[in-house]
């Protein structure tokens, strides 16, 4: 799809499962060298092994994205393994579902560290390498929850994802000095391993509420991230792409009908 991705060195945080796994696989198919980062060692190694078994290049690094030393180690290992860093996909995130009245303040802090602080750390750790390269790409995985809509039990998640977009705007201005673009993909309802626990009836109802009548696939998010990383998107920074199958359109139509 995008020949400029071939031989690029890419980090995907939260790359062992879900959306991150999809992003890693999409980049690997385009010939990128992918460093998969996650806390889960077994899952991370399995994902890297799967990519290699399909002809791709991938390694795994265990990483706590909320810890500065761990993120620096991730970047250093990427350089050791692949000779540099070209693309940072800050995808890692957590989304426990707890209503505000029941939420422990520590849970709020944990979600902010995993979802928001991690984006800052990944960008900060990448800048020296991007400066050395003469440029680079950062892609954040945000969400429609928070910036566009809300969902009961996800006040902390929504706040963290909204915070990512605030960070994105200022980061795009600061990173331009290094010829680095930073953009965000905002997924809607994407089918991942975790959703299977909800049951088929619930998933069918969820899909029926989406104009395209299906849940998104992790590769849909990977393809959007791939676009932002490509040479063809080199004049785009500080922007977002909503990948939701038109999920938020009915809400807009309902608002218009009420006028």
Predicted feature residues:
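Alpha-helical segment proximal to the catalytic Tyr-Lys
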Residues: 128, 173-174, 234
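Active-site helix of classical SDR
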Residues: 123, 160, 168
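The beta1-alpha1 cofactor-binding region of Rossmann-like NAD(H)/NADP(H)-dependent oxidoreductases
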Residues: 63-73, 105, 219-220
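Short, small/polar-rich loop/turn modules that mediate ligand/substrate recognition or access, typified
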Residues: 176, 181, 236-238
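Conserved glycine-rich cofactor-binding loop
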Residues: 16-18, 40
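Substrate-binding pocket helix/loop in short-chain dehydrogenase/reductase
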Residues: 99-100, 107-112, 195, 206
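Short C-terminal tail/terminal secondary-structure segment
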Residues: 4, 237-259
